[in-house]
Amino acid sequence: MLELNFSQQLGDLHLQVATDLPAQGITAIFGLSGAGKTSLINVIGGLTRPQQGRVILNGRVLVDAEKNIYLPPEKRRVGYVFQDARLFPHYRVRGNLQYGMAASMRGQFDAIVGLLGIEPLLNRFPFTLSGGEKQRVAIGRALLTAPELLLMDEPLASLDLPRKRELLPYLERLAQDVNTPILYVSHSMDEILRLADQVVVMDAGKVRAVGGLEEVWASSALRPWLQREEPSSILRVSVIGHHDRYAMTALALGDQRLWVGKLDAAEGNSMRIRINAADVSLALQPPHSSSIRNILPVKVAECLDVGGQVDVKLAIGEQWLWARITPWARDELGLKPGQWVYAQIKSVSFNRQNGPVPD
């Protein structure tokens, strides 16, 4: 558990954070430029000192301003991956990886190298590497220090699109195969959707929302960032099985079934899906004949007027589904909170896929 309760004045920015974060998975720190994202992880990493408050990691006090306790960065057991890789230019990749490597990680060296796909790079110097390769080496070096927490400050920000696409699959593998919790700073929605388990939304130095990705995505906290885009829903599902006759896969969504094009995934695998609100239409009764395969009963939670459209928040089990309709459709259907309707889902896209769902 990472316990944060501190304040810090940085020029015009007043950083004020009071929240607890789980010591597992990837927690995305999200917000616009100047929101305080990097300032937050700099306090955790020991690069800056807050004027008030405490930072506690797994019961160890990293910061207690009132007692003048500021554990130096090298004693915090916190790894840091910067926007630029900051490799030692006079060391080969192997030397960079071994610099600061914890004795307990010597037996893990080959596994980390394999996980990040950098074995062919071990004898090369940093100046011969691409941006994506440098970042993979930087991540490996940080992991080999045996950190209790890994901080990543927009590791894709300095990369062009091809290099981002090159590095993202390795970050996804990292999320699945390494037990080290990660705080991942980003202002990219796409990165967060692919990588994050939890999300912290920051604005003007303060935490505006914190929770699981699906929960925060469905809340109003992200709406200021989503208004320019088509709203969507993020849902957690698992594979039930595959159709005997058609190239279709059945997914469990709560106690309901969702059909999608056939996936190369075993029964029990969990994954995250994204459904655009414009791909969800509503009906008071299920149609008798329709080309749409997914027609699910849902309960209306609220209706929001947004720029001449209506966004309808729908409860589906313990998760939330958004539909975007016209005011005319809302009035004709007589939609109101608590009402049961049928959601017709036309299209589904996929984000990160995980392993079997535990019992």
Curated annotation (Swiss-Prot):
Its EC number is 7.3.2.5. One of its GO terms (cellular component) is plasma membrane. It is a peripheral membrane protein. Its main location: membrane. Residues 289-354 form the Mop domain. It comes from the Bacteria. ATP binds at residues 31-38. GO terms for molecular function: ABC-type molybdate transporter activity; ATP binding; ATP hydrolysis activity. Pfam families: ABC_tran, TOBE. Belongs to the ABC transporter superfamily. Molybdate importer (TC 3.A.1.8) family. Part of the ABC transporter complex ModABC involved in molybdenum import. Responsible for energy coupling to the transport system. The complex is composed of two ATP-binding proteins (ModC), two transmembrane proteins (ModB) and a solute-binding protein (ModA). This is Molybdenum import ATP-binding protein ModC. It comes from Yersinia pseudotuberculosis serotype I (strain IP32953).
